[in-house]
Amino acid sequence: MNPAPNLVMIGPMGAGKSCIGRRLAERFGLDFVDVDQAIVEQVGSSIPAIFEQHGEARFRQHEAEALHGLLAQSNKLVSTGGGAILDAGNRQRIRERGFVVYLHVSVPAQLTRLARDRNRPLLQRPDREQVLHGMAALRTPLYQEVADLTLETDHLSPAEATAQLVLRLAAQWRMSSTPA
C-alpha cells in the first residue's frame, strides 16, 4: 500500500486531477478532497469571487492554509489546484505528506477540455493559449520537482488514466515496501 500518509494529485488545470482523483480514491479506499472545493467551503465564496474581491495573492494564502490542514491528516487523496506548487512551502509539505502523482496535459488538450469552463479566473482573457503556455513554462519544472510518478493524460479517458495509475501505483508501492 501507499508508503506515504496521503496520495496527492498535481498538474495543470484540465489534466483530470479531480475526475481521476475521485476514481482513484474510490479504488484505494481513500477520502477524496479537492483543495479548491475546501477553499470554497471555508471562505464561503466561489474561486472566481475570491480572485475578483481579494486577488490571486489572497487566494494563494487560502490555498496554502487549506492544503496544510488537509495534508496534516492521513488516508486522503488530495487534488490540488494547478498553482498550489508555486509556493515553496506547499511543495515541501506535498512531498513530506504525500505520494505525488503528476498528471501532465498539453496546452492544446487543455484548450479543448477547458473551452466552456468559465470558473477559471486566470483564463478569463482572450489570450487563453498564451496564458496556458506561460503557466506551463513556469509550473512544469515545479510539478516535475515534486512528482513521484507522472502520467500523460492527453489521449486518455478518465477510466483509462485511472486504470493505468492503479497498475503503476500498485507496482511502485510494492517496490517501495520490498526490503533491500
UniProtKB/Swiss-Prot annotation:
Coiled coil segments of this chain = none
Question: Which cellular component, as a GO term, is one annotated location?
Answer: cytosol
- Stated EC number for the protein is 2.7.1.71
InterPro entries, per the entry: P-loop_NTPase, Shikimate/glucono_kinase, Shikimate_kinase/TSH1, Shikimate_kinase_CS
Q: Which Gene3D superfamilies match?
A: P-loop containing nucleotide triphosphate hydrolases
| GO molecular function term, any single one | ATP binding
- Where, by residue number, does substrate bind? D36, R60, G82, R139
> What is the free-text note on the cofactor?
Binds 1 Mg(2+) ion per subunit.
GO BP field: amino acid biosynthetic process; aromatic amino acid family biosynthetic process; chorismate biosynthetic process
Q: Which reaction does it catalyse?
A: shikimate + ATP = 3-phosphoshikimate + ADP + H(+)
- Pfam families, A to Z: SKI
Q: In which pathway does it act?
A: Metabolic intermediate biosynthesis; chorismate biosynthesis; chorismate from D-erythrose 4-phosphate and phosphoenolpyruvate: step 5/7
Q: Where does Mg(2+) bind?
A: S18
Is NAD included in the keywords of this UniProt record?
A: no
Q: Which cofactors? A: Mg(2+)
Q: Where in the cell is it found?
A: Cytoplasm
Keyword annotations of the record = Amino-acid biosynthesis, Aromatic amino acid biosynthesis, ATP-binding, Cytoplasm, Kinase, Magnesium, Metal-binding, Nucleotide-binding, Transferase
Q: What is the enzyme's main class? A: transferase
Top-level taxon in the UniProt lineage: Bacteria
**Which amino acid positions bind ATP, per UniProt?**
G14, A15, G16, K17, S18, C19, R120
What SUPFAM superfamilies does the record point to? Answer: P-loop containing nucleoside triphosphate hydrolases
Its function, per the record, reads: Catalyzes the specific phosphorylation of the 3-hydroxyl group of shikimic acid using ATP as a cosubstrate.
Q: Which family does it belong to?
A: Belongs to the shikimate kinase family.
Q: Could you give the subunit structure recorded for this chain? A: Monomer.
Full protein name: Shikimate kinase
Q: Which organism is it from?
A: Xanthomonas campestris pv. campestris (strain ATCC 33913 / DSM 3586 / NCPPB 528 / LMG 568 / P 25)
